Amino acid sequence: MSTPLSSTPPSFSLAGKLILLTGGAGLYGRGLAAQLARAGASLVLASRNVAALETVANEEKALGHEVSARFLDQDDEPSILRLRDSVVKEFGRVDGLVNNAVSRPMKTIDGPLSQWEASMKTNATGLFAITRAFGEDMVRRGSGTIVNIGSIQGTVGPDFTLYEGLGMNALPDYFFHKAGMVNLTRYFAALYGPKGVRVNCLSPGGYYNGQHPTFVERYSKATYLRRMADDNDLGGPVIFLLSDAARYVTGVNLPVDGGYTAH
């Protein structure tokens, strides 16, 4: 029997890496912030809600982690460029970008087109703009990695039977822009790969957030692991993709869904 390692292999560590995480206080973001910080990253959180990010940063700093908060309006390219320039000026570089920010203004299929357009401004145009801005800086330095947080809803169609009778729904804008994210990942991986920059996508499955028990039961039965994802399920795969352990991994969409899309 092999003797267990006393510590994580260095290639899996984020120690010494400056990671920017967008949307660092929400459903995925809070758990990711904690796990990235505990993996050794120097972490910058960015979103419109700086007050919420400051709370997260202070909680993590109390644990001895290096975490700070910045304002970002992903709808606004000048805001993206100001964020990039200020972080690079302060820290010298950004080693990893985690595109986790998302806006979901469309609540029903019958919603006004203005809701669709608002969704695309953040989740499509904004995603492109921030990836290009930070990607160009990584290319100039010849290294870096980008992880896009997608969804299984970007790779499979909706199962409306999961929502029947529950007042819940699957909304078209989310399916549209998460599917686009997967192929935009491949585009940037092909463009930036020869210049030393890796780009990958991670697509979580259903994430438990206090949903109706009937939905939780239905969804869980559709997975091989018979449960929804929780805060402990995303950090490890994201850390792997950001780390040097994944140095030969680029252009992939990694499902983290308990087997939901393996059917």
Regions found by a protein language model. Name each.
Residues 2-13, 239, 250-263:
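Short C-terminal tail/terminal secondary-structure segment
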Residues 14-44, 188:
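Canonical Rossmann dinucleotide-binding motif of NAD(H)/NADP(H)-dependent dehydrogenases/reductases
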Residues 85, 122-143, 153-154, 186-190, ...:
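Amphipathic alpha-helical dimer-interface segment in Rossmann-like NAD(P)H-dependent oxidoreductases
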Residues 95, 102-103, 112-129, 143, ...:
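Catalytic Tyr-X3-Lys loop
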Residues 100-106, 259:
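Conserved NAD(P)H cofactor-binding loop of Rossmann-fold oxidoreductase domains
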Residues 107, 147-193, 206:
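Catalytic loop of short-chain dehydrogenase/reductase
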Residues 107-118, 160, 219:
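Substrate-binding pocket helix/loop in short-chain dehydrogenase/reductase
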Residues 193, 198, 249-251:
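Short, small/polar-rich loop/turn modules that mediate ligand/substrate recognition or access, typified
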